[in-house]
Amino acid sequence: IPGVDAGDEKAVKKAREGLKRQLPIRAIHYYKFRNNHRSSEDAVPESFLFQTTIDVDDVDYVDAALEKARELNCSNTIWKGKLLHLEYSARKKLHIDIRMPMGMTIEETQKAYCEAAGIPYDKSCITPERIIFITDKDSEIYRSKEWYGVLPDEEIKARREAFLKRGLTIDGKGTARYSLLAGDCKSPER
């Protein structure tokens, strides 16, 4: 990094973090927030993507996690066909984007996938406002045509109903204010 003493690990780390903060971002759970304010309270339930990103932050797990992601995607488990995207992160670790199994919350999905993949669970990745820094094309390993794709209306309805039947909101984020077992799922309060 120009102007930074390569022998000063602390200065190099600080400079890299500064460069990282200049990268564009992507929200991993929602595509819309009220008043353009990225927070849990302002996440618009109808904009829930039904996908999440597993963030492999320990370099010792990257190669094994990459192989396991491919293996799980082809397995006869709930993870079959769920892999949406693989990329190296800004710090050359790994992001694994997956479609959430029907009825599972972000936290449930993250915990179950990490267990199946044999990688550490990172609870900081389950917040509605979570973002990931976008890296260059060379960092992309795999991209499904379904990544950030709009799900069919019937699938969205089925996924929302699966949450509602559990007493959760349509995005699985919290407790529904009232139970809805039939009808539409348009109210942001549900």
How would you describe each model-predicted region?
Residues 1-92, 99-108, 168-169, 179-183:
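Signature for HUH/AEP ssDNA processing cores
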Residues 32-60, 100-189:
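DNA replication initiation modules
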Residues 88-94, 126-131:
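Short Gly/Ser/Thr- and Asp/Glu-enriched loop/turn motifs at secondary-structure junctions
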Residues 94-95, 142:
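Short, well-ordered, mixed-charge alpha-helical segments that flank or form enzyme active sites
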